[in-house]
Structure formats: C-alpha cells, structure tokens
Amino acid sequence: KECMADGTVCYIHNHNDCCGSCLCPNGPLARPWEVLVGNCKCGPKA
C-alpha cells in the first residue's frame, strides 16, 4: 500500500498512512480537532 507524501493533509482516520508522521501546528496529533479540520499534514518521521 502506498503511503501519503509529505505535505499531504492527514486526518485522524488516515494519519497512519503518512510516509512519515502526521504533523500538526502544535505538535504531532496535538489536538483531535486540528486533525479533523485538516490543519495537519504529513511530514518527516517524528
């Protein structure tokens, strides 16, 4: 299965699909609502 490239918006249901980590402005999966509204993007492995 392919992973999602860095910069791809990641959500709570697919944050494990990032090639690296699902990063939010306040840290990885910092606040559930940030993930839900699309503020988080795939980035380098934390």
Swiss-Prot record:
A single GO molecular function term of this UniProt record: toxin activity
Tissue: Expressed by the venom gland.
GO cellular-component term (any): extracellular region
Annotated stretches, region: Keys region for toxin activity: 31-33
InterPro entries reported in the protein's UniProt record: Insecticidal_knottin-like_sf (IPR053718), Toxin_28 (IPR012633)
Keyword terms, alphabetized: Disulfide bond, Knottin, Secreted, Toxin
Main localization category: secreted
Top-level taxon of the source organism: Eukaryota
Disulfide bonds: 3-19, 10-22, 18-42, 24-40
Annotated compartments: Secreted
Purpose of the protein: Insecticidal toxin. It inhibits insect voltage-gated sodium channels (Nav) by partially blocking the channel pore in DUM neurons from the American cockroach, not by acting as a gating modifier. The inhibition is only partially reversible after prolonged washout. In vivo, the toxin causes flaccid paralysis followed by death when injected into Heliothis virescens larvae. It also causes uncoordinated movements followed by full paralysis to sheep blowflies (Lucilia cuprina).
Family under the similarity heading: Belongs to the neurotoxin 16 (SFI) family.
Domain notes: The presence of a 'disulfide through disulfide knot' structurally defines this protein as a knottin.
Name the record gives this protein: Mu-segestritoxin-Sf1g
Natural source organism: Segestria florentina (Tube-web spider)
Organism placement in taxonomy: Eukaryota, Metazoa, Ecdysozoa, Arthropoda, Chelicerata
